[in-house]
């Protein structure tokens, strides 16, 4: 016990956790770039965001946003345009969630509910079908860019 807390009364034990994040839907475009039309972006070079500050939550998601921002930055510098991932992919669906309009934006991990759903998927194998569709979308995206 911490001596200074010896007389403290605890209503509930727990932990404190705080996320620092921006309102990504308001400030970032589909590539996690600061929207150039915003006043705060007028006098600075193009700026991309990644990690927890975007409202993604989790280590894997932090890596995904870092890769995604770097990929789109490179595409913009080298080719003059960005190259987002398909919405059917896990990373693409998370990125869409980070930048789509949302009045009560809060950090989120990836989950299968972010992927586009189609009628008729049975609960029994729904995640498996969505995962296969996500993998296929990424493979097609890679093949279309001759990166395989």
Region locations from a protein language model:
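An active-site-proximal "capping" alpha-helix that borders the catalytic cofactor pocket
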Residues: 61-76
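Glycine- and aromatic-enriched mobile tails/lids
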Residues: 53, 72-148
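A glycine-rich dinucleotide-binding beta-alpha-beta segment and adjacent secondary-structure elements
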Residues: 1-56, 63-65, 83-99, 105-111, ...
